Amino acid sequence: MDIRGAVDAAVPTNIIAAKAAEVRANKVNWQSYLQGQMISGEDCEFIQRFEQKRSPEEKQELLQAEGSQCAKTFINLMTHISKEQTVQYILTMIDDMLQEKHQRVSIFFDYAKRGKNTAWSYFLPMLNRQDLFTVHMAARIIAKLAAWGKELMEGSDLNYYFNWIKTQLSSQKLRGTMGAIETGTVSTSDSSQYVQCVAGCLQLMLRVNEYRFAWVEADGVNCIMGVLSNKCGFQLQYQMIFSIWLLAFSPQMCEYLRRYNIVPVLSDILQESVKEKVTRIILAAFRNLLEKSTERETRQEYALAMIQCKILKQLENLDQQKYDDEDISEDIKFLLEKLGESVQDLSSFDEYSSELKSGRLEWSPVHKSEKFWRENAVRLNEKNYELLKVIEQLGGKQLVMNHMHHEDQQVRYNALLAVQKLMVHNWESLE
């Protein structure tokens, strides 16, 4: 699947779209703001002319001639008017304008440069407001400015925005009110749709390679994995896996992603998936991990993890089905071929190593083979004791000791034997 073909990241969720339609229908009486000296005559005159331009051609002509005035008016209105309904209206107009033509972000960059500001500096403070619609429209505009503009968001602004995204995704329960201010509550359904809006902002940001590195540095992968492990709805699931797919377009990111249990988590979701779009994005993510990795060892590690998680069997089952989307069939064919090649080169120790790294060991015959351990025990020390460190991280010693009281006699026996050998080894070291 090509990155250019994935266009739904900027599409608003149902609740955002419905509220935006409601906001557009409630026209603002700009004349009353002018009479109350809350806005200037210049801004009042321009916003009224802007509203009168119905066709895209008329609007484009106005923006080409008076782009600077447009940015100035929108920002003045947004910062000087406190009424929430009017702020919502202004943000919706800005979002619509940018969505119609992505290049229009330049009018905000040009205006900001004159005041030695950044284009998003006017919108970032709005992330702290109470109204959910206002907050998320501002978040969408920030993402569009950052993703579609010629200048990159950097430093404290980018850290602030990414931390806000992480907080929203991690909580999945956004505070504030939207429309139903009388009750002071937001339904679970509404809340989940706002989280999807946040995920959409992340999807848009991660299309830009530089932002992928910044997201990873902000510990963003842990945030994504946390959401996926939290049994979220299929739409948010899709968006988080979409984000992994975007990250995996970068070879360096493929290297970094080895630290996380991505393959087992996606494998579990694939097995339970009933939505074709979720299946499609998982297969595309798997393909990127194998195809974009430049290091042979990295590709091999991902392939082994997929084999260990029984992805081959799932692919064979999926291959029997018919799909409208050609990308799915192509990705299945690619993965079957690559994993088939890896199976040929797979040694028993490779399989054991892959199982251990995934935290999913299976009691297969090879694990009980004395010959296997005589030949391979020393290999646990390879790569600066990499596998021994994994065992330590998994709490291997404590797990073995827990099994000394296991109901199965064979398990108890092996656990006692292992603990005995550990103690003997420690005594010998002390001597």
Residue ranges and their predicted role:
Residues 73-76, 108, 119-125, 161-169, ...:
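Buried hydrophobic core positions in alpha-solenoid tandem helical repeats
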Residues 312-323, 404-406:
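Conserved blade-ending motifs and adjacent loop-strand segments that build the rim/top face
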Residues 64-72, 106-118, 154-163, 213-219, ...:
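Short sequence/structural elements of tandem HEAT/ARM alpha-solenoid repeats
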Residues 35-48, 82-99, 128-147, 158, ...:
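Alpha-helical solenoid repeats of the armadillo/HEAT superfamily
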Residues 57-144:
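Eukaryotic helix-linker segments that join adjacent hydrophobic helices
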Residues 74-78, 94, 123-124, 158-166, ...:
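Extended amphipathic alpha-helical scaffolding regions
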Residues 1-86, 99, 333-387:
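N-terminal "cap/leader" segments of large eukaryotic alpha-helical scaffolds
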